Amino acid sequence: MKAIIITIGDEILLGQILDTNSQYISRQLTRLGAEVADILSIADQREEIWQWVDYAMKQAELIIVTGGLGPTKDDVTKKVLAEYFDTRL
């Protein structure tokens, strides 16, 4: 199974925090027999989230999105994913 991990957060891109989630998730997926095809770190921006989720949907059977769910107004991940998948979260 081909997997893509998407980590969302300006803090990661700015080097303010370390992305340990992707490292852990990748190790576990590999242990379970999945092929991690890509690990993406992207900004907390609607267009970027939409673009990379759309890319991942066309490339992988499993997509894991982590981050982008903090209390600040720039954390729009939940809203964008609900719109993308045309559902409530």
PLM regions: where:
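Non-catalytic beta/alpha edge segments that cap or flank active sites
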Residues: 1-89
